[in-house]
Amino acid sequence: MKRIYLALCALLLLLGTGSRPAAAYPYYAQMAYDNPREATGKIVCANCHLNAMPARAEVPQAVTPGQVFTIKVGIPYDLSKQQVLADGSKGGLNVGAVVVLPEGFRLATEEEMTEEQRQETAETYITPYSDEKPNILLVGPLPGEQHQEIVFPVVAPDPKEDPSVAFMKYRVYIGANRGRGQINPDGSLSNNNVFRAPATGRLTSIATIESDLSDLPPELAALVPPEYELPGTRVLSFETEGGLKHLVVPPGPELVVNIGDSVQEGDPVTNNPNVGGFGQVERDLVLQNPERVKWLVAFLAAVAITQLLLVLKKKQVELIQAAELLG
């Protein structure tokens, strides 16, 4: 089942943005990590989405066993921005999110949700991270224009049924990304990056793929990796002290150097096309014992009644004292 699901994700990947999208796909984490949250607390989406952007989250302060509640994740960004797609063209940003719940908490089924909750989640397909980690929820990619906020329906566990769960305060870890990443799952760079000079020297030539790889001289064509074999890919040649050096720049990033320009190693030779980024927040969530709530309500009621009786007793004493003075 998992293989079928990953295949579906790959199909969406291909249809959505080209051959190597590095998009807002939290599912990429499933391919490389057993747990999307590292020991340091960092959610691994940040390893591919290198730019930091805000994430917002609304989490209830407290819930009771069996309660179906919602966690709302906000993914704000400038809707006028467009990102560079895998083929170098411009398009809208996709968004995705991951919610790391305490163990025992899980995604609510449609039957468990209220009508309002079903409507809030009707256009989102949320899945557990894996069969072993049903407490970690993923969603995305989704069109960012329609999904500035994503709602996760969650069921709270019952410590009476699950001894591993206790009535206590927990932490919820939430990550939200928008736009394509800078690192592909295999570790290669996507075209949503700044490309830099490989060595100190002078730019001597720029060869461009107009239609296919045959547009380049054979010695340059051999340098182009398969994922960059696209119209618009450029091969920059630099004259350096160590001989001729080359840099392959995929379509999308715009060159900021011209033939004849001198560069230092590490200097940017393109602009930074990235307009997206990843954000992470943490929230407290209390699993409340309903029996304690009942006793608390009873205690508060007793305190209120006691205070009322004291007030009445005081009034009674005042009336007696007034009568004695008049008598």
Curated annotation (Swiss-Prot):
Q: Which PROSITE patterns match?
A: CYTF
Q: Which family does it belong to?
A: Belongs to the cytochrome f family.
This protein's GO CC annotations? plasma membrane-derived thylakoid membrane
> Which residues are listed for heme binding in this entry?
Y25, C45, C48, H49
| InterPro entries with a match to the protein in the record | Cyt-f_TM, Cyt_f, Cyt_f_lg_dom, Cyt_f_lg_dom_sf, Rudment_hybrid_motif
Q: Please tell me whether the keyword Metal-binding is annotated for this protein.
A: yes
- Where is the protein localized? Cellular thylakoid membrane
Note the superkingdom of the native organism: Bacteria
- Keyword Thylakoid in annotation: yes
Outline the subunit composition.
Answer: The 4 large subunits of the cytochrome b6-f complex are cytochrome b6, subunit IV (17 kDa polypeptide, PetD), cytochrome f and the Rieske protein, while the 4 small subunits are PetG, PetL, PetM and PetN. The complex functions as a dimer.
Q: Signal sequence span per UniProt?
A: 1-24
- Name the membrane topology term: Single-pass membrane protein
Its required cofactor(s), as named, are: heme
- Cofactor binding note: Binds 1 heme group covalently.
GO annotation terms (biological process): photosynthesis
Q: Kindly provide the name given to this protein in its UniProt entry.
A: Cytochrome f
Task: State the organism of origin.
Answer: Synechococcus sp. (strain JA-3-3Ab)
Provide the transmembrane region boundaries.
293-313
Gene3D superfamilies, from UniProt? 2.40.50.100, Cytochrome f large domain (2.60.40.830), Single helix bin (1.20.5.700)
The protein's GO terms of the molecular function aspect are:
electron transfer activity; heme binding; iron ion binding
Question: Which PANTHER family does this UniProt record tie to the protein?
Answer: CYTOCHROME F, PTHR33288
Entries under SUPFAM superfamilies matching the protein: Cytochrome f subunit of the cytochrome b6f complex, transmembrane anchor, Cytochrome f, large domain, Rudiment single hybrid motif
Keyword entries, A-Z: Electron transport, Heme, Iron, Membrane, Metal-binding, Photosynthesis, Signal, Thylakoid, Transmembrane, Transmembrane helix, Transport
Role = Component of the cytochrome b6-f complex, which mediates electron transfer between photosystem II (PSII) and photosystem I (PSI), cyclic electron flow around PSI, and state transitions.
Q: Where's it mainly located?
A: membrane
